[in-house]
Amino acid sequence: MDPAAPVAQFTVPLGGQKIEMHQMDFAAGGLALLRVRIREGKRFTVFDIDPETARTWGEAMLAWGRSHPGSPP
């Protein structure tokens, strides 16, 4: 596995969760996954997702965000 390449990092305004996204490249087989890491205090939740799932998840989040314009963060 190659080193993780940072994609994005931000903090959720309301809950304070820290979200990090990294690209994970696996040399054997050419597999690339997006690692989403959510930190809530001392607890971590980690998802490794494939490109198709990332697109589906991202599109769903964009659609929801666009349907709530002007909402406070």
Positions of PLM-derived features:
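Positively charged, low-complexity terminal tracts
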Residues: 1-73
